[in-house]
């Protein structure tokens, strides 16, 4: 049931919006950039749910393998470094081998608590003992949210992605796109679980991580954890 649901409201959506999504994702978030640049020279890690691979070149002194379920995003990211197509619950990496891991804006797309826990465990599994992982998830408590989220609202929501016409019809000629009413753009609904304050921390600790740092940034909760 959950697999079919996520396939419809997460995976199929990203397959359709991949190019448009990638074109809006190019600037590293400061917390992620700081984490990557703090890693020792020669560190080897994984970026699980890497999207278009925008973090691949942040620190040229580390080696990072990206993975994502979306084939189109992996093709885009493959120009930046080593990439694999992989589901977030079954990544093809050996256990206890990597120094660090990223999970940026991924866990909130899993549709129940057990699957979210499995996803966090799968981020920690490839790490050596003491390896570090950085997690980012959307927050329920979004200050001054333009999306209308609040701590009194529901945690499981749909968030629309308005696909611009040139991405819906990539082979159309420019003159064919002129005069288009933006109201006719297609809205694809993506599923999100909005995390309450402390919920990500509890999930990471249950999965076998120890919290080193945590905070709030850009409408997200984030955690840096060490594998026990």
Curated annotation (Swiss-Prot):
**Where is the protein found, in the record's own terms?**
Cytoplasm; Nucleus
Q: What is its main location?
A: cytoplasm
Give GO cellular component annotations, separated by semicolons.
cytoplasm; cytosol; nucleus
- Pfam families from the entry? Methyltransf_11 (PF08241)
Question: What keywords does the record list, in alphabetical order?
Answer: Cytoplasm, Methyltransferase, Nucleus, S-adenosyl-L-methionine, Transferase
- The top EC class, named as a word, is transferase
Q: Name one GO biological process term.
A: tRNA wobble uridine modification
Q: Which reaction does it catalyse?
A: 5-(carboxymethyl)uridine(34) in tRNA + S-adenosyl-L-methionine = 5-(2-methoxy-2-oxoethyl)uridine(34) in tRNA + S-adenosyl-L-homocysteine
Under Enzyme Commission nomenclature, its number is 2.1.1.229
What is an example of a GO molecular function annotated in this UniProt entry?
tRNA binding
From the record, give the transmembrane residue ranges: none
This molecule's function is given as:
Required for the methylation of the wobble bases at position 34 in tRNA. Appears to have a role in stress-response.
Q: What name goes with this protein?
A: tRNA (carboxymethyluridine(34)-5-O)-methyltransferase
Species of provenance: Schizosaccharomyces pombe (strain 972 / ATCC 24843) (Fission yeast)
